[in-house]
Amino acid sequence: MSNKKLHFETLQLHVGQEQADPATDSRAVPIYQTTSYVFRNSQHAADRFGLRDAGNIYGRLTNSTQGVFEDRVAALEGGVAGLAVASGAAAITYALQNVARNGDHIIAADNLYGGTYNLVEHTLSTQGVETTIVNPSDFDAVDKAFKPNTKAIIIETFGNPNASVTDVDRISEIAHKHNTIVIVDNTFGTPFLFRPIEHGADVVVHSATKFIGGHGSSLGGVIVDAGKFDWKANADKYPSIAKPDPSYHGAVFAEVAGPAAFVTRIRAVILRDTGAAISPFNAWILLQGLETLSLRVERHAFNTKKVVEFLANHPKVAKVNHPSLPDHPDHALYEKLFPNGGGSIFTFEVKGGEKEAWAFIDSLKIFSLLANVADVKSLVIHPATTTHSQLSPEELEQQHIYPSTIRLSIGTEHYEDIIDDLANALENI
C-alpha cells in the first residue's frame, strides 16, 4: 500500500493483513486455533517473556488472529495499540483496574450502561475504589468531583439506554486540567461515526459484541490506547504504568512499551493474572463483522431517523428520547458531533405504564425481545424490569427509566417493515 492516508472503508478491510497470510498465503485472516507457540531457542523464549521481542507467548495473552483484530480496531479509532478481551465488560473492568487500586478514586457519568454502573458503584467499591457519579453535562459538577487520588473518568459517547450525548471535548479538557485520563466507551458511537481520541480521549473501550460484530453471534471487547498521555510526567499518580512493576521484574511499562504502555500493562499483568482472553474463533467472527461496519452503521442510522420521526408523531407515544429531535437537550451537541446520524439504541415512553409497555413489546413480530443491542436485527426490551432491574427506584429515575420506558435497537431491515411492526404493536395498547 502507498503512504497515502486510507479511508475508513478501506482500513476496515485491510489493516493487520496488508499482505496475504505469511504462513499459508491465505487472503482471509486464518483462525489460529492454538494455545501455545514454539520458540526458536532458549534465548528467543527469554526475550519474548522479557518483552524485549514482540510476538506470541501464550494463547491467554496473544494470538495472531486476535492480533489482526486488535490492530484493525486501533487503526479505525486512531489509536496506537489495541487489546481484545473476552467481553465488553472485561474491557471496561480492565481499563479501570489498570489505573485504580485500593484507596483510589474514579468518576463515572450517571448515564452509563447499567452493568458499568454496577461495576463502578458496587463491585469496585469492594476492591477499595471510591466512585463519584456525576451528570456529564454539568461541567461544574464534573470539575468539582476530581480529587488528588482520582485516576480516571469514564463516560459513554451515547448514554445507555436513552441516547444522551456526551461532550467528550469538554470532559477531556476538564480531566486533563487535573492530569487524569479519560476513558470513553464508544460502543454505541462506533469509530465510523465518532472517534473519541480526536476529541481528547486517552483510552477507548468497546463491547465488540455490539456494532463491531454486528450479528449477535459472539462476545468480545476491545481496549484502544490513544498513546498520548504522558505517564512518566505523572508517575506518582500512575505508578502501575510509570514506575517499576514488581510482578514483572521491575519493568516500567511507560519505558518498555512507550506510547502503548496502557494496553501493554493490561496484557502483561492483568490479562495474564485474571485471564479474560478472547478466543481465536470469536476474534475471527468479530473481524468478519468489522469488515462491513461502515455499511451496516449507515443503514442503522438511516432507519433510526425514519423510526424516530414515526414515533415522535404517534398519539400513543408520550415521549421519544433521541437527540436528533429539536426539543432534546443534547440536540445541538448531537448535530455537531454526529453529522451523519447515529443513536440507533434509544428509548421512548408509551402512554400508560408497565402494563402498556409490556403489551406493546409482546405484540411485536419483527423485533426480538432480548438483552443484546446493535444487531442487524431490530431488538426491544423493557429496561426497568430487565437490563436495569438491579438499580433502585431512585437510580432508575436518575437515569430517566420509568415503567413506561421501552428500549429499541434499530436494525437493518427495510425501514417500512420496522415501522409497520411498531405501528401494529402500538395499536394493541
Regions found by a protein language model. Give the residues of each.
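Conserved PLP-enzyme active-site core in the AAT-like
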Residues: 2-3, 16-20, 83-314
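N-terminal "arm"/small-domain region of PLP-dependent enzymes with the aminotransferase-like
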Residues: 2-63, 71-72
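Conserved N-terminal alpha-helix of the aminotransferase class I/II PLP-enzyme fold
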Residues: 41-93, 115-122
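Conserved small-domain helix->loop->beta segment predominantly found in fold-type I
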Residues: 274-283, 288, 292, 297-299, ...
